[in-house]
């Protein structure tokens, strides 16, 4: 059986976050190792769901849990950047540091999550835009992943899909003659709404169409296939997500 569902960008972010909490590697890292969630719009949802999964009722405003932001011209931020990244150390949550001060103490078995700005679905590749002249948070993240085998997970929404391999786009963006932000390929495990649907329901989804208006800008249509029971689970999940308000920062 196949059903078609629509997800707004905010619904997709919430879905990704919930899917990650159902992932055995993520759960293992949170409870028995270290999980570092680097600030970003999607990772704000991940941090919320992580607190909920741990039964941690502390106040957390995901609006300020961010780094660089792509926003419409003239848009006003509602909250100041919080200035921290969230570390979950053997089930205990810390908000007293950032990736630069925390990641050097992480090693094999630990996990770091870093969002992305570009997604090439055919090869499961992601890239992140770089505004800082020293490379920003991505440099210590990749160093930990490659140098110490810290697992790197890249939560990224389907609205960020691109039409060429990430290395090719990075070559264009990083050329000496280019202007604007640079791009860095991310070597970790890419995690999208498609992965979340599979994790939460067992159904398989493919991207069918995209785009909308009146709050559905950037939305995606997915064709989801599975058993009757799985599709019932998908419909129930989408109904639950449908009340998700638009993302605020």
What is each model feature region?
Residues 50-90:
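A phosphate-binding glycine/aspartate-rich beta-alpha loop in the early core of alpha/beta enzymes
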Residues 2-26, 76-248:
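Conserved phosphate- and dinucleotide-binding cores of soluble alpha/beta proteins
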Residues 28-64:
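N-terminal low-complexity or amphipathic/hydrophobic leaders
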